[in-house]
Amino acid sequence: MNQKLVDALWKLQVDPSNTPNAEVIKQNISAEEGQWIQLEILERWLNDGKTLGGWKIGMTSGESRDALGPGVRPFGFLLKERLLNNRAQIIRDQLYRGGVENELCFFVGPSEGSDETDGGLPNIAGCAAGFEINQKRLPPGCPAGVRVGDNLSNWGVVAGHAVEVPKNLEDLSVTLFKTEPGRRGKELEIGRVKSNDHIDDHFDSLRVLAARLEAFGHRLQEGQWVITGAYEKHPFEVAHFRGHFDLEIGDVEVSLTSTQQ
């Protein structure tokens, strides 16, 4: 394993304001090597006292779809300490660079009744409207394999209230709103995205994730959260954000604040 690259990515995980060695951070590694490096980063977080809280499946939507090649879907990990409840408040400056992204969040149920080992669908207990908090730690121009090693930019996830998973997620429409400070509660619509032709089938993504994790020595566990791809997104700024998911999934809210509220 490329230990210099692991060390450089770890330093960025701990402090994204670090300036990495360009020769190290821009090595052209494969997505598979990046996946193993990412798991080494996870191991360092676990050794540092953090807890694994779930997973994400990447390259499933929008411009990033198939960025590593047709059907290539790397995974990323979610730290439990950064799985936040609805209406979470996060200090903007602690996030460095990045943005909020509306994502559907799934909750893994008991393994009984799951057929994921046969390439089937994992047992999912429910889903919720969600936000992924993405932190841009890498400098521009880094190869895709390095992006995988950097955990696909994940910082954390905010999830709304759990509901039963609708059967017709291909019809899902998601709208992102923001309210800026000083606008007296006036909410602005940022954009609206529909599942159809934008994102991989969510159930297929869950199957792919389960198979990918198994190939790398991991598996979905009861209570874990899973996100499956971005809908609308917006760069970080001090503001209140709300995502509305139709099909009776509901809303999720997060506030990026200038100070601790």
Stretches with model-predicted labels:
Residues H202-V238:
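A conserved acidic, glycine/proline-rich C-terminal tail/linker
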